[in-house]
């Protein structure tokens, strides 16, 4: 079944619910009358709700309408491409060196236009110290404030604590000429206080 918009003589129904060029509701009229009104206004009769009974048609400039629809579709695709979510996983007792490394990855992701989900992973008795996670997330949010903002505040998620950071508008454009892709930094990063993934001491 074709989804192409029907215009003018391609609208083959006996009557339509007509909307005028200014958005005014004209009412149900014969198709011949609707076509005549559109022609007198040097505009097009466009079927905007074909599944209604009777179909809804609007008098408009169809060329301009097609252009606006295409613009909205492009904007929608652009927005979808910008909703990539990266993830950084940290332990609540992270040392300063590893924190700076992870922070730099978060900054790069934000500059690239990606959102970042930051997850604090608690183990064992660490679960009784949620304030450690809150402090770490608050610190990170403040440290990257020039590159993004806290979209979803810190919250407990089972044994973990999460926060979502979003880039400032235009971040990807500003950063494209300054930074290449982060070498070796994937979508998920997991470190503990020593920089090891298993929590064992050096």
Swiss-Prot record:
Record keyword Iron present: no
GO molecular function, one term: translation initiation factor activity
Gene Ontology cellular component list: cytosol; membrane
Pfam families: IF3_C, IF3_N
First-listed, main subcellular location of the protein, grouped into a coarse class: cytoplasm
Claim: tRNA processing is one of the keywords in the record: no
InterPro entries: T_IF-3_C_sf (IPR036788), T_IF-3_N_sf (IPR036787), Translation_initiation_fac3_CS (IPR019813), Translation_initiation_fac_3 (IPR001288), Translation_initiation_fac_3_C (IPR019815), Translation_initiation_fac_3_N (IPR019814)
Region: Disordered, residue numbers: 172-202
Biological process (GO), any one: ribosome disassembly
Keyword terms: Cytoplasm, Initiation factor, Protein biosynthesis
Locations listed in the record: Cytoplasm
Family: Belongs to the IF-3 family.
Assembly notes: Monomer.
UniProt function note: IF-3 binds to the 30S ribosomal subunit and shifts the equilibrium between 70S ribosomes and their 50S and 30S subunits in favor of the free subunits, thus enhancing the availability of 30S subunits on which protein synthesis initiation begins.
Designated name of the protein: Translation initiation factor IF-3
UniProt gene name: infC
